[in-house]
Amino acid sequence: METDTGALPKKQDFSEWYNEILWRAEIMDVRYPVKGLYVWFPYGFAIRKFVYQHLRELLDRDHKETLFPLLIPEQEFMKEAEHIKGFEDEVYWVTHGGTTPLEVKLALRPTSETAIYPMFALWVRSHADLPIKIYQIVNTFRYETKQTRPLIRLREITSFMESHTVHATWDEAEIQVESEIALTREFYRNLCIPIIISKRPDWDKFPGADYTIAVDAIMPNGKTLQIGTVHHLGNHFSRTFNIQYEDKNGEQKEAYQTCYGISERCIAALISLHGDDKGLILPPTVATFQVVIVPITIGKRHEDVLAAAGKLKNDLENAGLRVTLDTRDLRPGAKYYWWEIRGVPLRLELGPRDLDSGKAMAVTRTGEKTTICLANAAEDTTSILTGITDAIRAKAGEHTKSHLCTTHTMDGLDIALNEGKVAVVHWCRDRTCGDTIEEKANSSLLGTEVRSEYIEATDGPCIICGKPGKATLVGRTY
Ligand SMILES: Nc1ncnc2c1ncn2[C@@H]1O[C@H](COS(=O)(=O)NC(=O)[C@@H](N)CS)[C@@H](O)[C@H]1O
C-alpha cells in the first residue's frame, strides 16, 4: 500500500511522531469510523504475530491456551460487587438479537473473570483438579472516557492476553504471581523494553483483587505506560462464584486465584522506545523482516547481481531468517528509505564489485556499517543481528536510566516530573500523604516494592510527614 513520502516529525515531538509512524510504517489505520477502534495493516499485524508468538511460547511452558465466549450474561457480570464498581462505567451491553429485545442483557467482556469463573466453579471439585492455569488472547471492550490512542488506550482491545489461575492456597497463588512476573521480565527482555515493577497502592488495584503488581515502561516523553499487570485475587472471586474444592481430608475449601494481563500496549512500547527520526527500529526477534537485500543493479552484470542476491536470500532463509529481496524498479536510496521507516534491522547491499570480493555491505538500522562474507552469509548475518539486539537493548536501558531519579523533597519531585522523569520518593503509605503527593505534584503514585535494575529502592522518611516511609514510584501516566 502506497503511503505518503516526506520527512517524519522529529521523535522529540513524540505525539506527532507516534501518530505519523503508525501510518507511514503501515502499523495501524486509524480511520475506522468508531472511536477507539483501529485497523491493523498487514505489516503491523505481522509484528503483532511475532510478539504474541513469543508470549505464547512463554505462557505455554506453564499454562494451557483456551477460548471463552465474548458475551457475559448480566447476572454473572453483576455478581462481584467490587468488580462491577470498577467496570460499570466501562462495560458495553448487547440488548437485542436482531429486532428482538434480549431477556437477559449481555456484557461485551471488558476482561473475562465473570465469563470464566462460573465455569471454574463447574471444573473444580477436588484438590486433584488444581492448579488450573489457562490463558486466552482475545479482544475485549472498555468504554474508555479518557483520550483514546491506537495501541495505548482502545475501546476494543484487540490483543488482550489474559491468564487466569486457580490454586489450593493463598501462598500457592502468590508463587504464581511471582512466576507471571518472571515470565513478564523474560517477555520484555526479548522485546528490549526495560520495565519497572511495583505494587499499586490499594486505591489503584484491580477491582476485586487482594493486590496488583504492575509493570511500567517509561515512554520517550517521560510518561509511564502500564504494559502489564498481575493480580492476586485471594479468595474474593472464588467466594462469589463458589469455586470450592474437596481437600485431602474431604473438607470443602475455597480456592485462591490470580489473573494476569498484557495488551497491545507492549507493541506501543516497542515502537515508541526503539524508533528514531527515520522511523521504526525493530528488534530482530519480532521484526516482520530481519534482513532486506537491496541489489545494486545499475550498470552491467545485472543478471549476475540478481542471481547472487537470490542465492543470498536462500542461504539466509535456510538458516531460519526472515528475508525480503527488494527488486522493485526504484533507486537504491528510495529502497533504503522505505525499509528504514519500517524498522528492518539489517540491510544487505549487493553490487557488481561485491561479487568479485565475495562480500556484501551490511548496514544496521542501529547505525553500524560492516560487511558479510557471502560464503559465510548466515553466520555473519546472525552475529550482526545479535549485535543489533544488544544495541537496541542498551539504548532503551540508557533512556530508562536517564529518566529515573530519587528525590527527597516535593520541589525535587516537581522538577523531576517537569523534566519528564519518573521519581522514587519515600512514602509512609498513609493515604492522605499519598493524595498530597499526587495533588501537589500533579502526578500518579505508581507503587511501592519497586523492582528495577535501574534504581536502588531504599527506605527513608516520608516526603510529606517524615514518618518511616517506603521507596515509592511516582510519575505522570498515560
Ligand atoms: N483501554 C485499554 N487499551 C489498551 N490496553 C489496556 C486498556 N486497558 C487496560 N489495558 C492493558 O491491559 C492490562 C490488563 O488490564 S487490567 O485491567 O489491568 N487487568 C485485567 O483486566 C485482569 N483481568 C488481568 S487480565 C493492563 O495492564 C493494561 O496494560
From Swiss-Prot:
GO BP: prolyl-tRNA aminoacylation
Record EC number: 6.1.1.15
GO function terms (MF aspect): ATP binding; proline-tRNA ligase activity
Location of the protein in the cell: Cytoplasm
SMART domains membership: ProRS-C_1
Pfam families reported in the protein's UniProt record: HGTP_anticodon, ProRS-C_1, tRNA-synt_2b
Principal location: cytoplasm
Any one Gene Ontology cellular component term annotated for this protein: cytoplasm
Catalytic activity: tRNA(Pro) + L-proline + ATP = L-prolyl-tRNA(Pro) + AMP + diphosphate
Keyword ATP-binding: yes
Top enzyme category: ligase
Record's keyword terms, sorted: Aminoacyl-tRNA synthetase, ATP-binding, Cytoplasm, Ligase, Nucleotide-binding, Protein biosynthesis
TM helices/strands, residue ranges: none
Stored InterPro entries: aa-tRNA-synt_IIb (IPR002314), aa-tRNA-synth_II (IPR006195), aa-tRNA-synth_II/BPL/LPL (IPR045864), Anticodon-bd (IPR004154), Anticodon-bd_dom_sf (IPR036621), Pro-tRNA-ligase_IIa (IPR002316), Pro-tRNA-ligase_IIa_arc-type (IPR004499), Pro-tRNA_ligase_II_C (IPR016061)
Main function: Catalyzes the attachment of proline to tRNA(Pro) in a two-step reaction: proline is first activated by ATP to form Pro-AMP and then transferred to the acceptor end of tRNA(Pro).
Family assignment from sequence similarity: Belongs to the class-II aminoacyl-tRNA synthetase family. ProS type 3 subfamily.
Quaternary state and interactors: Homodimer.
Domain comment in the entry: Consists of three domains: the N-terminal catalytic domain, the anticodon-binding domain and the C-terminal extension.
PANTHER family: BIFUNCTIONAL GLUTAMATE_PROLINE--TRNA LIGASE, PROLYL-TRNA SYNTHETASE
Annotated protein name in UniProt: Proline--tRNA ligase
UniProt organism field: Methanoregula boonei (strain DSM 21154 / JCM 14090 / 6A8)
